[in-house]
């Protein structure tokens, strides 16, 4: 189809084509104040906040909602217990399409590393057309877990009750139960 001297591609596409191109620049974004791969560290009763520091990556999270199952999983994590595949497979998941880094690919890799299974192996995974659809499903109890970029609560905490149907503040109804490695 032709050639280009410069192009903008995702980190995932770079991995696929790294033999054919070089990195000249990389994107930066504002970091958030929570960066641990331990989900319990994210559940301190405060919503993640943007910082003045720049970061070359972000993380994907597994966010448990206010449903009975979501709160059961969150309680296990906050008590220092390891989640099992059966724990996760018995939940209803809201996921993005299979090309989404934070909404599918990295959570699938996280599952693969821990359980030898991926999102495709889950009994109850529902594909959402947007993160706001996933948030609505989470708030209403249609989903127990959603996968998303790590700063989703920073972006949507103010809308949790009014737009998504939450019955309490987002920080009180959700919690992080899994955190992926950095997405570049």
Where are the predicted features?
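A residue-level structural signature of the nucleotidyltransferase/glycosyltransferase Rossmann-like core
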Residues: 5-6, 61, 92, 145
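Short beta-strand->loop
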Residues: 22-55, 68, 124, 158-184
């Amino acid at each position: 189809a032709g050639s280009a001297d410069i192009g903008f591609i995702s980190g995932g596409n770079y991995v696929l084509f790294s033999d054919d191109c070089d990195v000249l620049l990389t994107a930066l974004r504002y970091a958030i104040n929570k960066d641990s791969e331990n989900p319990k560290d994210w559940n301190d009763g405060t919503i993640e906040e943007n910082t003045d520091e720049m970061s070359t990556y972000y993380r994907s999270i597994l966010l448990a909602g206010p449903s009975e199952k979501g709160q059961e999983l969150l309680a296990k994590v906050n008590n220092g217990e390891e989640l099992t595949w059966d724990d996760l497979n018995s939940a209803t998941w809201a996921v993005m399409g299979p090309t989404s880094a934070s909404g599918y690919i990295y959570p699938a890799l996280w599952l693969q590393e821990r359980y030898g299974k991926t999102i495709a192996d889950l009994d109850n995974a529902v594909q959402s057309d947007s993160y706001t659809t996933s948030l609505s499903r989470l708030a209403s109890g249609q989903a127990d877990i959603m996968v998303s970029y790590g700063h989703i609560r920073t972006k949507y905490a103010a809308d949790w009750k009014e737009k998504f149907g939450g019955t309490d503040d987002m920080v009180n109804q959700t919690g992080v139960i899994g955190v992926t490695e950095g997405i570049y």
